[in-house]
Amino acid sequence: MGSIAGFSSAVLSKLGIPVPYAPRLLAGGWVVAGWAGLAYGVYLTVIALRLPPGSELTGHAMLQPAFKASMAVLLAAAAVAHPIGRERRWLVPALLLSATGDWLLAIPWWTWAFVFGLGAFLLAHLCFIGALLPLARQAAPSRGRVAAVVAMCVASAGLLVWFWPHLGKDNLTIPVTVYIVALSAMVCTALLARLPTIWTAVGAVCFAASDSMIGIGRFILGNEALAVPIWWSYAAAEILITAGFFFGREVPDNAAAPTDS
């Protein structure tokens, strides 16, 4: 892992992502997670190209749920080495809950998979908010940030209105409404968070885009036509959200940092 992590730090530096404090485990785990997300995206794309448009893309292999969840699991492992203890305590469960949601949404044969997957991601968003909220309180927001928050709230309300007539059929009115509120709160908190880079904010918007496509596919189209772009947007979301936390920052003197190996 040491050689992978060293190579990862060099790659990140060449990409212009500074790593002033990133331990080897963190940088290496983040890069390996990115490769896992890329690999699953390619796998999903190949399946989609072999099937008629709108076909179900999950349930094609016994290990597909584990494959899908591997990116978030690896990001959680990387987050264990995050030097800022308060953020680490929120990020690790957020990513493990995301992995749980990935797993559940990859087992379509279970009737309750969507509802429990929704619940797992709802809790993940609350954990992300826990990590982001102190960063959003550090200074008065700029007009641009406020405008982005307003746009996010308007878009979320519009989606809920669009989905609303279709939610009662599966008794999902309350769960989906609560989820959209939590997702919107997470994205708005990310847009307001004071971080050295824009990656976390961009990642949060990608998360909203991914979940919006899930809702459109399930409640409007009634098929899996958007499954491939959903994954790519979601993978970008998790990678970018964590990049904003992990890289380009200085460690506060009072941070409880795990030892680097």
From Swiss-Prot:
Molecular function in Gene Ontology: hydrolase activity
InterPro entries xrefs: TMEM86B-like (IPR012506)
Membrane-spanning intervals of the chain: 29-49, 65-85, 90-107, 111-133, 146-166, 172-192, 197-217, 227-247
Source organism, top-level taxon: Bacteria
Pfam families linked: YhhN
Protein function: Specifically hydrolyzes the vinyl ether bond of lysoplasmenylcholine (pLPC) and lysoplasmenylethanolamine (pLPE) to release a fatty aldehyde and glycerophospho-choline or glycerophospho-ethanolamine. The cleavage activity is specific for lysoplasmalogen substrates, and there is no activity on 1-alkenyl-sn-2-acyl-glycerophospho-ethanolamine or 1-alkenyl-sn-2-acyl-glycerophospho-choline (plasmalogen) substrates. Confers a growth advantage for mycobacteria in host macrophages, possibly by cleaving toxic host pLPC into potentially energy-producing products.
First-level EC class: hydrolase
Catalytic reaction list: a 1-O-(1Z-alkenyl)-sn-glycero-3-phosphocholine + H2O = a 2,3-saturated aldehyde + sn-glycerol 3-phosphocholine; a 1-O-(1Z-alkenyl)-sn-glycero-3-phosphoethanolamine + H2O = a 2,3-saturated aldehyde + sn-glycero-3-phosphoethanolamine
Record keywords: Cell membrane, Hydrolase, Lipid metabolism, Membrane, Transmembrane, Transmembrane helix, Virulence
Protein name per UniProt: Lysoplasmalogenase
Family the UniProt entry places it in: Belongs to the TMEM86 family.
Cellular component aspect of the GO annotation: membrane; plasma membrane
Regulation: Competitively inhibited by lysophosphatidic acid.
